[in-house]
């Protein structure tokens, strides 16, 4: 659910199901309505309180973060400020597919594939340093988790908080732009009572 539509959705949930009581559980805010309907709202940054106004404010406030997308076919790194892409760097790299050859050929191809994947991580790490700098920032990451961990380690960003993981196709600039609203969106899980009335 886009962050700017969350307030309206919460209002409709309450009007359909009755008064709502909020409670924090893990990284989500659980909203329990009078009729037993339950909605678990997951945001990239958890609200400090458990009421509707704070939830909406927390969703709207998450607008500045680093976006790091890495897959074997390339990488895209962006700095997002107030919900807009302010700086980015993208690149593609060739990583050979798996082979069905056996013996020495298989080992040679595996080494070549590993070296090519390392080159992707090195290039992506350079982009992280260039675009995001050295000051720790909140990150949203997407793609191949092994390559992402390697990229963050190489760039010195492995200690930075990662608040969300996205599934993405091969990273390009447009994929980076399309990932911004997904990174900021609220994820809502409903129980059967909430789904039965089409919340």
Describe these PLM feature segments.
Residues 1-199:
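Terminal alpha-helical anchor/extension segments at protein ends
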């Amino acid at each position: 659910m886009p962050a700017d539509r969350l307030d309206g959705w919460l209002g409709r949930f309450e009007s359909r199901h009755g008064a709502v009581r909020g409670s924090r559980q893990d990284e989500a805010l659980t909203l329990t309505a009078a009729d037993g309907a339950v909605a678990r709202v997951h945001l990239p940054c958890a609200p400090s309180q458990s009421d509707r106004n704070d939830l909406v404010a927390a969703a709207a406030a998450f607008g500045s973060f680093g976006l790091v997308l890495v897959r074997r076919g390339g990488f895209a790194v962006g700095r997002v400020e107030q919900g807009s892409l302010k700086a980015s760097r993208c690149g593609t790299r060739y990583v050979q597919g798996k082979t069905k050859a056996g013996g020495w050929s298989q080992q040679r191809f595996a080494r070549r594939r590993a070296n090519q994947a390392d080159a992707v991580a090195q290039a992506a790490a350079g982009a992280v340093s260039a675009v995001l700098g050295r000051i720790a920032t909140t990150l949203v990451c997407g793609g191949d988790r092994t390559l992402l961990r390697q990229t963050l380690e190489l760039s010195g960003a492995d200690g930075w908080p990662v608040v969300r993981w996205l599934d993405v196709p091969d990273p390009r600039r447009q994929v980076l732009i399309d990932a911004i609203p997904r990174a900021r969106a609220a994820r809502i899980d409903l129980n059967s009572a909430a789904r039965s009335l089409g919340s």
